[in-house]
């Protein structure tokens, strides 16, 4: 799979996506990297620590988050994407579910669309992905937590996302799937999904796992956001062991990169 100018050999190793929230209210690091110079320094740190992709977000998706306008989101993400691309040769992902934001981000240099609604919120998203021929990550999400059979329902929901993408002209080789840990699921459902991650492989696409510092970890370990590094690392290792983690999206790049590398050495020989 090619993302930007970089080739990603799926199955060879686990790739690290470093999170850069350019927002004032993200659940984990809101407001921390709101200044472009500070953000660029953090990007360099993530790259030095093993990041293969930088995921830029301009709207928090934490529970109860405030929806921002397309214009506001564009004004947040475009300058930082341009700054990253100017200073570093690394693929950039745009974390958005809005087509206009995605298009402006790609024009600014973004190489991948990461949509927490799997192209279901804004149907023009698939058209943008097809138009620019960029890879896209389709995440499982729901407005509710009512499932008849959790894993079967997740697979069926993801199939719908895939069909939306392909009907718009997105190429098969440009699709990545995300089981959506922490979205549209209860604590118990998140644990069940984690324990059955290998089922996502049945759909035949690369998988991105995003569990970093999430409430599932906080509830399990009774820890605040800033103390969830070890719990996140555990989920990264589990994902790799289940052969269901080609990309891992994390805040704490160094710790997860090292854990992923060690796990890869053991299981991907």
UniProtKB/Swiss-Prot annotation:
Mg(2+) binds at residue 21. One of its GO terms (molecular function) is metal ion binding. Coiled coil: none annotated. Gene3D superfamilies: Dihydropteroate synthase-like. Its cofactor is Mg(2+). CDD domains: DHPS (cd00739). Pathway: Cofactor biosynthesis; tetrahydrofolate biosynthesis; 7,8-dihydrofolate from 2-amino-4-hydroxy-6-hydroxymethyl-7,8-dihydropteridine diphosphate and 4-aminobenzoate: step 1/2. It catalyses: (7,8-dihydropterin-6-yl)methyl diphosphate + 4-aminobenzoate = 7,8-dihydropteroate + diphosphate. SUPFAM superfamilies: Dihydropteroate synthetase-like. Residues 14-261 form the Pterin-binding domain. GO terms for cellular component: cytosol. The keyword Transferase applies. Catalyzes the condensation of para-aminobenzoate (pABA) with 6-hydroxymethyl-7,8-dihydropterin diphosphate (DHPt-PP) to form 7,8-dihydropteroate (H2Pte), the immediate precursor of folate derivatives. This is Dihydropteroate synthase. It comes from Clostridium beijerinckii (strain ATCC 51743 / NCIMB 8052) (Clostridium acetobutylicum).
